[in-house]
Amino acid sequence: MHIKLANPRGFCAGVDRAIEIVNRALEVFGPPIYVRHEVVHNKFVVEDLRARGAVFVEELDQVPDDVIVIFSAHGVSKAVRDEAARRGLKVFDATCPLVTKVHMEVVRYSREGRECILIGHEGHPEVEGTMGQYDASNGGAIYLVEDEADVAELQVRNPDNLAFVTQTTLSMDDTSKVIDALRSKFPAIGGPRKDDICYATQNRQDAVKQLASECDVLLVVGSPNSSNSNRLRELAERMGTPAYLIDGAEDLKHEWFEGVKGIGITAGASAPEVLVRGVVEQLRAWGAAGETELDGRPENITFSMPKELRVKAL
């Protein structure tokens, strides 16, 4: 068996920044540091931060007064921000700047009085945060669609004053079909100046397409609640390559590799490289020989830290 590694894989700039915000807050202010929702969707990362003093909660009513709160990389609604401000909580915002970009688009559409359609997965925290940016007090509305069937059933108030945005971690192929359906049904619909699906999601999906065409089985290192990790698994399966979403080496099963010559490995944007190395080591122990990494698109993007948490230059 030969191992091929996707490139790029694993942490993106938004995840790096979110984790570093929690780490720096713990260093500067000491525990406990409260984090609304898992800062990123990865069990290993969350457990590591919890061991260092981060306290993960789902709602602000679980947060005592006079503590530091961090908003997760997925973003929050205006109502959550307003509640934190009302209570005077000290907040550090780890929302990915590319999610914030989508939030600003929704706010702009709301101010313009345009109805808005969000393409995304119901119940995902990013979707909840984005939906919560829209102010319907001016008579507008925001709608959520997941697929072409939802578009077929959707009724809006004014199809001539309409715009769409998307969740940042969707399948590019699936989303393009939904956008085509929206444009067909609502010819006047507007959209973002630039694709809302983030660069890291696009790059990792492109890498999986290449990897799935060259391997007999694909492993995606990522947690079950990670949207972008699930999309990677689905993409490989759609190409006819058996694919498995795993938290780490402990999830591997011998029977997946019977008669297999090429094993592809990638990792979702929330999964650290240490988990990938653990998978590689386990496969080597089971007889895998050789390891290559695909040529990939370089990722040089970084996002700035909140001023109060920046490391001072020596």
From Swiss-Prot:
Enzyme class: oxidoreductase
Keyword terms: 4Fe-4S, Iron, Iron-sulfur, Isoprene biosynthesis, Metal-binding, Oxidoreductase
Active-site positions on this chain: 126
Any one GO BP annotation for this protein: isopentenyl diphosphate biosynthetic process, methylerythritol 4-phosphate pathway
Listed InterPro entries: LytB/IspH (IPR003451)
Cofactor binding note from Swiss-Prot or TrEMBL: Binds 1 [4Fe-4S] cluster per subunit.
Keyword Ribonucleoprotein: no
Binding site for dimethylallyl diphosphate: 41, 74, 124, 226-228, 270
Database matches in CDD domains: lytB_ispH
Binding residues for isopentenyl diphosphate: 41, 74, 124, 226-228, 270
Pathway annotation: Isoprenoid biosynthesis; dimethylallyl diphosphate biosynthesis; dimethylallyl diphosphate from (2E)-4-hydroxy-3-methylbutenyl diphosphate: step 1/1; Isoprenoid biosynthesis; isopentenyl diphosphate biosynthesis via DXP pathway; isopentenyl diphosphate from 1-deoxy-D-xylulose 5-phosphate: step 6/6
Binding site for [4Fe-4S] cluster: 12, 96, 198
Cofactor(s), by name: [4Fe-4S] cluster
Pfam families documented for this protein: LYTB
Gene3D superfamilies: 3.40.50.11270, 4-hydroxy-3-methylbut-2-enyl diphosphate reductase, catalytic domain
Binding site for (2E)-4-hydroxy-3-methylbut-2-enyl diphosphate: 41, 74, 124, 168, 226-228, 270
Record-level Gene Ontology MF annotations: 4 iron, 4 sulfur cluster binding; 4-hydroxy-3-methylbut-2-enyl diphosphate reductase activity; metal ion binding
Assigned EC number: 1.17.7.4
Domain of life of the native organism: Bacteria
Catalytic activity: isopentenyl diphosphate + 2 oxidized [2Fe-2S]-[ferredoxin] + H2O = (2E)-4-hydroxy-3-methylbut-2-enyl diphosphate + 2 reduced [2Fe-2S]-[ferredoxin] + 2 H(+); dimethylallyl diphosphate + 2 oxidized [2Fe-2S]-[ferredoxin] + H2O = (2E)-4-hydroxy-3-methylbut-2-enyl diphosphate + 2 reduced [2Fe-2S]-[ferredoxin] + 2 H(+)
Protein function: Catalyzes the conversion of 1-hydroxy-2-methyl-2-(E)-butenyl 4-diphosphate (HMBPP) into a mixture of isopentenyl diphosphate (IPP) and dimethylallyl diphosphate (DMAPP). Acts in the terminal step of the DOXP/MEP pathway for isoprenoid precursor biosynthesis.
Family that this chain belongs to: Belongs to the IspH family.
Protein name per the record: 4-hydroxy-3-methylbut-2-enyl diphosphate reductase
Organism, as annotated: Ectopseudomonas mendocina (strain ymp)
